């Protein structure tokens, strides 16, 4: 999870890069913040996928077997 203010800082640095450019320290900070953001995003997305169930219009569970296997591993079954 991103700490409060990190997304705002990412956006600030992105806007500054477009308008006036960034110092080397700011470029490094921007890269680190982006990596943290991507890590949090991927973790959140994976968590959502591991809780997903696909159902057809008739109410039958049609979740792909690969996803079911991954969900079992994720839950430790």
Curated annotation (Swiss-Prot):
Higher taxonomy: Bacteria, Bacillati, Bacillota, Bacilli, Bacillales
Protein name as it appears in the record: UPF0291 protein EAT1b_0405
Pfam families for this protein: DUF896
Keywords: Cytoplasm
Species of provenance: Exiguobacterium sp. (strain ATCC BAA-1283 / AT1b)
Compositional bias (Basic and acidic residues): 63-77
Membership in a protein family: Belongs to the UPF0291 family.
Database matches in Gene3D superfamilies: Helix hairpin bin
UniProt-annotated stretches for the region Disordered: 53-77
InterPro entries assigned to the protein according to its UniProt record, in alphabetical order: DUF896
GO cellular component: a single term: cytoplasm
UniProt-annotated location(s): Cytoplasm
